[in-house]
């Protein structure tokens, strides 16, 4: 199966990066003609995110999960199979799960902790289309500090006033629904959270690509601040005004989608079996 075009020419201003010169190709999210087409697109992108996270060495045993809502049945979501190597996940391997934890499509088990948390996030926040959580080294190290990130780079500024530290169920394996609901409620309207003593969560309001990019950027921001603080020198913070300006222009759903396109293109070109 070959993937559909990932983008098309823009007909209107979609990003500060969009050129003013006419006739140039500029990526733009696709427009779907049917719910089936949109479902396939979301599943393809979710499988691609699994491959990308494997490339980036975000895997840690069976820990980690990514999800996206079904476009026709918003109370159901697609997710990766439990204990399957992220580097081999294909479109046909993805599981369709409801909020009761029932696997409606697929024949693999679902990650129980992943189901409890992601199901609660999707239930509590109807604006969330996709979510990502992995046990990454930098994310877990920063989560152990129980602090939000400081605006010390443009990357970190992208999360200015749009990420939070969650202390509910800190360090505990969340496998019961009440615990999952508590974490989801504390998530608020943020696009990212640092779950103390656990790791990072990100969500996408408009696309799977968005959620994936926020996770990549958040993991990088954690790494950068850990390294900067390790020097022992005081951090030079970006001013609140400049951080807010960067967040407004560089941290939009469209900007995140654009950032993910070259990453997606690379994995789609070199690992076409993900579309099987």
Residue ranges of model-derived segments:
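An anion-binding catalytic pocket shared by soluble metabolic enzymes
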Residues: 32, 36, 43-132, 139-152
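A contiguous binding-surface segment within folded domains or other stable secondary-structure elements
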Residues: 165-202
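A conserved C-terminal secondary-structure "cap"
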Residues: 2-5, 9-49, 189-276
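A general structural signal for well-ordered alpha-helical packing
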Residues: 118, 139, 180-184, 208, ...
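Short, flexible, solvent-exposed loop/turn segments with mixed acidic/basic and small polar residues
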Residues: 93-95, 155-157, 189-193
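Divalent metal-coordination and catalytic microenvironments
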Residues: 68, 121, 135, 183, ...
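Short acidic/polar capping segments at secondary-structure boundaries
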Residues: 84, 136-139, 146-147, 170-173, ...
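Class I SAM-dependent methyltransferase SAM-binding "motif I" and its flanking Rossmann-like core
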Residues: 137-179
């Amino acid at each position: 199966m070959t993937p559909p075009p990932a983008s098309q020419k823009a007909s209107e201003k979609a990003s500060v990066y969009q050129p003013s010169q006419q006739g140039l190709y500029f990526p733009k999210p696709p427009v779907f003609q049917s719910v089936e087409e949109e479902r396939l697109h979301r599943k393809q992108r979710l499988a691609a995110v699994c491959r990308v996270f494997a490339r980036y060495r975000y895997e840690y045993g069976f820990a980690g999960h990514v999800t996206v809502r079904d476009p026709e049945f918003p109370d159901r979501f697609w997710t990766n199979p439990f204990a399957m190597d992220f580097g081999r996940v294909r479109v046909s391997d993805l599981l369709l799960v409801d909020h009761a934890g029932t696997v409606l499509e697929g024949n693999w088990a679902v990650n129980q902790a992943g189901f409890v948390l992601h199901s609660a996030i999707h239930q509590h926040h109807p604006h969330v289309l996709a979510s990502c959580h992995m046990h990454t080294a930098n994310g877990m190290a920063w989560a152990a500090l129980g602090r939000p990130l400081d605006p010390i780079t443009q990357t970190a500024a992208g999360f200015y006033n749009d990420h939070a530290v969650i202390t509910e169920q800190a360090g505990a394996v969340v496998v019961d629904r009440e615990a999952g609901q508590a974490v989801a409620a504390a998530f608020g309207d943020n696009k990212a959270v640092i779950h103390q003593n656990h790791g990072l969560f990100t969500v996408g309001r408009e696309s799977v690509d968005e959620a994936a990019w926020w996770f990549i950027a958040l993991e990088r921001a954690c790494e950068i601040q850990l390294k900067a603080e390790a020097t022992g020198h005081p951090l030079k913070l970006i001013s609140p005004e400049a951080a807010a300006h960067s967040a407004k222009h560089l941290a939009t759903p469209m900007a995140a989608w654009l950032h993910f396109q070259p990453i997606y293109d690379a994995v789609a070109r070199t690992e076409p079996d993900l579309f099987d």
